[in-house]
C-alpha cells in the first residue's frame, strides 16, 4: 500500500461528499457562484483523482444569475441507492444579513457522467442538505436549519424530514430537530449513516475558519433530540494544532473500502504567513481556498469513530489495502489552444454558462465579447480556472483593439467581485493602446500605471501576458513577440485573494483564487477580444533554498 499525501484535491474543492460504488470512489464539492455547479472527481484508490463532468451544467438544473458572491451551490451531497446516483444541492440566493434565502434540490442519474434529471424542489429550511437512505426503504433529508429572528441563534440545529419515495416530495409534518450541536455552536453540514444498529450523525461546527471542527453523534432512533455527542475528544479539528500543515479540517463525509477500512474526506486549507507573521495569529492566508483532505478512521471499543493519529489528522495517510491504481496527471497544469467548440472542463464562468452572449471558442481561439467590469455580478465575459499550486505561471496571447478607456481585455487573478487584479489592454488619451494593471481591493479600485501605462507600439497586433504566482506575491509580465517578456514593476499581495483576508471585512466567503481571461466593455459597444494559446504551468508547492520547486510537504507548517 502507498501513502496518500494531503490534500488529495488541491485548490478550491470544499465541503467534500464522498461515496463508493463497487470499486470506485466519487467526491462531490461545492462550487458556490462558479458555473457549472458541483465539481466531481473519481478514483479507485483515494490517492489519485480524475475530474468528471459537472452535473449542474444547464440553467434548467442551476440558474444563478444575480446570485451574490459566495452564494450559489453550498455543500452538495452525493449518494447511491436503488441503482442510481442521487445528488442534493443548495442554491443560496441571499448571504448577507439576517436571511439566508435558499432552495434545496434533488436530481438523479444512472451514470455519474449524466444525464441528470430535471431538479425536484425540496425546501428552503436550511442549507447543507443531504439524503439518507435507511435500510427499511425510507428516505430522509437531513439539513442545517436557519432562523432569521435576531433574538434567536441563526443556526437552529439539524432537522430531519422524511421524503415520500413515490413523489420525491418532502413531508413537512415529519420534520423534527434531531441534534442541536455542542456549545461550540454553528452546527451544519450533516451526513447520516446507519452502522451496527446505530444512526451516526456527522456534522460540522465552529464556522468555516480556523475554529472549524467535525463532531459525531449517534442514536438508536431518529426521534427528536435523540442524538448523543461522541464523548471525549472531538472527531476532527485543527483549532488546537496551529503547527499542522493541514488546517481548517471538519466538514466532510465518511466512506468504507471494499475490505472494510474506513476513511473520512474533509475540507481543509494550507495557510501561509508573510515574513515576520506568527503562525498563531494570524493563523495565515489560504489563497488556494478550502481544499479536500482524507484521513483514516478507526472505531474505538465503544463503537465511536476516531481519526488515526489524533483529531488533528495527518498530512500523510496510509492508503487502502485493496487500492486499485488510478492513472492521473502528475499535477493540474493545463494548455488550451481553444480548438474545441466547448470549453475545457477546468474552465468556469460566473453564475451562468458560457454562451454566445459571452463569446465563442474553437478553431484555435477564444473570442470574448466585452460586457460589464469585473465588479459586475450580472453580465460579464470571464472564464477562469482555480489556483491549484502555490507556485505557477499562466500566460496567454491577446488581440484587442480598444478605442476607449472603458474597454479592457487581458489576464486576471480573481477572488470575487470586490477582490481581483487585472493586467489588460486598454486605451488612454496619451498613448492610445496601452497596458495597464488594475486592482479591486475591498471594493476600492486602483490603477497602478496611470499616465505611465505601457504603450503598445504601432503595428503590434498581438500582446502576450503572463502572471507569475509565487505563493505570497504575484506579478505580471508582457511581451510583444511571445519570446522576450518584460516584468511590470508591480508586486501584488496574494493574501488579498484569500478567504481569510476577505473575512476581515465581510461575512462568509469561501471560494479561493482563480486565474482567468476577461473582456470588458462597460461602454456597451460589445468590443471583442481574441485569446490564443493559454498555458497554466504548475511549478510546485514549495521553493527550496537553491531556487528549485517541489511538491514536498511535512506534517508541520513552514515557519
Question: What residue ranges belong to the model's regions?
Answer:
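Carbohydrate-active catalytic/glycan-binding domains of CAZyme proteins
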Residues: 1-559
Amino acid at each position: 500500500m502507498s501513502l496518500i499525501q494531503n490534500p488529495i484535491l488541491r485548490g478550491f474543492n470544499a465541503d467534500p461528499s464522498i461515496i463508493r460504488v463497487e470499486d470506485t470512489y466519487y467526491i462531490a464539492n461545492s462550487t458556490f457562484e462558479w458555473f457549472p455547479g458541483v465539481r466531481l472527481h473519481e478514483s479507485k484508490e483515494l490517492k489519485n483523482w480524475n475530474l468528471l463532468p459537472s452535473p449542474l451544467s444547464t440553467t434548467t438544473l442551476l440558474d444563478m444569475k444575480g446570485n451574490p458572491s459566495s452564494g450559489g451551490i453550498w455543500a452538495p451531497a452525493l449518494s447511491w441507492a436503488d441503482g442510481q446516483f442521487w445528488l442534493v444541492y443548495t442554491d443560496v440566493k441571499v448571504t448577507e444579513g439576517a436571511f439566508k434565502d435558499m432552495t434545496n434540490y434533488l436530481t438523479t442519474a444512472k451514470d455519474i457522467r449524466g444525464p441528470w434529471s430535471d431538479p425536484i424542489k425540496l425546501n428552503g429550511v436550511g442549507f447543507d442538505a443531504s439524503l439518507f437512505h435507511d435500510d427499511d426503504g425510507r428516505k430522509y433529508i437531513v439539513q442545517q436549519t436557519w432562523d432569521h429572528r435576531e433574538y434567536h441563534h441563526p443556526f437552529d440545529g439539524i432537522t430531519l424530514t422524511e421524503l415520500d419515495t413515490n413523489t420525491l416530495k418532502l413531508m413537512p409534518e415529519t420534520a423534527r430537530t434531531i441534534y442541536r450541536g455542542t456549545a461550540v455552536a454553528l452546527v451544519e453540514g450533516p451526513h447520516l449513516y446507519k452502522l451496527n444498529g446505530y444512526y451516526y450523525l456527522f456534522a460540522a461546527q465552529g464556522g468555516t475558519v480556523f475554529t472549524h471542527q467535525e463532531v459525531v453523534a449517534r442514536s438508536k432512533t431518529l426521534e427528536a433530540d435523540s442524538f448523543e455527542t461522541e464523548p471525549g475528544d472531538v472527531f476532527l479539528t485543527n483549532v488546537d494544532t496551529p503547527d499542522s500543515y493541514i488546517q481548517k479540517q471538519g466538514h466532510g463525509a465518511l466512506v468504507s473500502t471494499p475490505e472494510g477500512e474506513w476513511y473520512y474526506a474533509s475540507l481543509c486549507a494550507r495557510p501561509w504567513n508573510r515574513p515576520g507573521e506568527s503562525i498563531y495569529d494570524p493563523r495565515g492566508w489560504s489563497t488556494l481556498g478550502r481544499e479536500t483532505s482524507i484521513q483514516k478512521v478507526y472505531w474505538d471499543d465503544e463503537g465511536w469513530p476516531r481519526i488515526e493519529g489524533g483529531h488533528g489528522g495527518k498530512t500523510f495517510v496510509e492508503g487502502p489495502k485493496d487500492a486499485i491504481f488510478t492513472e492521473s496527471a502528475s499535477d493540474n497544469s493545463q494548455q488550451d489552444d481553444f480548438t474545441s467548440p466547448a470549453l475545457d472542463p477546468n474552465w468556469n464562468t460566473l453564475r451562468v454558462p458560457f454562451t454566445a452572449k459571452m463569446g465563442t471558442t474553437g478553431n484555435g481561439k477564444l473570442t470574448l465579447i466585452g460586457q460589464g467590469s469585473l465588479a459586475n455580478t450580472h453580465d460579464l465575459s470571464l472564464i477562469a480556472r482555480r489556483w491549484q499550486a502555490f507556485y505557477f505561471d499562466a500566460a496567454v496571447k491577446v488581440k484587442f483593439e480598444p478605442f476607449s478607456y472603458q474597454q479592457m481585455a487581458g489576464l486576471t487573478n480573481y477572488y470575487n467581485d470586490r477582490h481581483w487584479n487585472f493586467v489588460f489592454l486598454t486605451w488612454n488619451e496619451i498613448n492610445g493602446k496601452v497596458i495597464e494593471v488594475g486592482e479591486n481591493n475591498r471594493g476600492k479600485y486602483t490603477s497602478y500605471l496611470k499616465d505611465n501605462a505601457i504603450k503598445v507600439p504601432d503595428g503590434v497586433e498581438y500582446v502576450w501576458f503572463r502572471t507569475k504566482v509565487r505563493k505570497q506575491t504575484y506579478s505580471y509580465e508582457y511581451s510583444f513577440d511571445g519570446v522576450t517578456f518584460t516584468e511590470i514593476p508591480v508586486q501584488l499581495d496574494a493574501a488579498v485573494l484569500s478567504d481569510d483576508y476577505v473575512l476581515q471585512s465581510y461575512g462568509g466567503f469561501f471560494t479561493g483564487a482563480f486565474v482567468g481571461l476577461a473582456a470588458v466593455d462597460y461602454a456597451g459597444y460589445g468590443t471583442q477580444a481574441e485569446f490564443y494559446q493559454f498555458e497554466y504551468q504548475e511549478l510546485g508547492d514549495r521553493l527550496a533554498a537553491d531556487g528549485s520547486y517541489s511538491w514536498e510537504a511535512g506534517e508541520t507548517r513552514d515557519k
